[in-house]
Design a protein with these regions (language model features):
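Rossmann-like dinucleotide-binding cores of NAD(P)H-dependent redox enzymes
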Residues: 1-52
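Cofactor-binding loop segments of dinucleotide-utilizing enzymes, especially the Rossmann-like FAD-
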Residues: 21, 119, 174
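A conserved short coil-to-beta-strand element within the FAD-binding core of flavoproteins
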Residues: 50-61
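FAD-site-proximal beta/loop scaffold in flavoenzymes
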Residues: 61-62, 69-140, 147
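SDR active-site lid
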Residues: 129, 156-164, 182-189
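Internal hydrophobic alpha-helix adjacent to the cofactor/substrate pocket in enzyme cavities
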Residues: 136-163
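C-terminal auxiliary extensions adjacent to catalytic cores
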Residues: 174-224
């Protein structure tokens, strides 16, 4: 990315350090794709500090819990998503990410006549797993919430939200990408092939149609 926005020489001079408080890289993604992620970090020249935390941020460096001082002009902090604080207005117990609990129909539990979808909603995708705060689940949740809200107004039967299929497609920079399936994230594809799939996903598949009415309605189909 530095090479694309500046020049290759600047990219080669840049020092990138990943600080992770866990004892391994990308702990939330499990063991299956980890070797590919680690290889991509090495390929990109990223230094890794495991079991570490940032204790202090100063004008031109950061100080780690171990006392190591890293000279820096840019600090990027990734600490996980947080739901909109508007959820607090519902007066219900929220999950650690600030999401409101929903039943299988995506109705907010304890709040009558209220449907919810996306990052603000905590709902099960199957009998074991809860939806993640990602477009993969938010898009389908939106379809079900809209479907059920409309049918509720008409006094028609509702349909439980279920989204059994789960995939992960992670961009790895120079290392291409890795595509996995299932909650155990079995690797199905990696490298340039997975990179092309990632580009297709972000540029086509998650973009809703804006043209013909028929295309818009087709995209909203629950089984589409």
């Amino acid at each position: 990315r530095i090479a694309a926005t500046a020049d290759p020489e600047a990219a080669e001079r840049a020092r990138v350090v990943l600080v992770e408080q866990a004892d391994r890289v990308a702990p939330e993604l499990g063991d299956n794709p980890r070797s590919l992620i680690e290889d991509a970090l090495v390929q990109s020249g990223v230094e890794v500090r495991l079991r570490e935390t940032v204790e202090r941020v100063e004008a031109d460096n950061i100080v780690l819990g171990s006392g190591e001082r890293i000279a820096s002009c840019t600090l990027i902090v990734t600490v996980g998503p947080r739901a909109s604080p508007l959820n607090e207005a519902f007066g219900v117990a929220l999950d650690p990410s600030g999401r409101a609990p929903c039943d299988d129909m995506l109705r907010v539990i304890g709040v009558p006549d209220t449907y919810m979808a996306g990052d603000v909603a905590m709902a099960h995708v199957d009998d074991e797993h809860v939806a993640l705060m990602s477009c993969q689940h938010a898009i389908t949740m939106g379809k079900f919430a809209g479907f059920n809200a409309a049918r509720d107004l008409l006094g028609l039967a509702l349909r439980p939200y279920r989204q059994i299929r789960y995939v992960t497609c992670l961009d790895l920079g120079r290392g291409g990408a890795v595509f996995t399936t299932g909650w155990d994230r079995e690797v199905q594809m990696h490298g340039d092939e997975a990179k092309q799939l990632k580009r297709t996903i972000v540029s086509e598949r998650i973009i809703p149609p804006t043209g013909e009415r028929e295309a818009i309605l087709a995209a909203a189909a629950l089984d589409g």
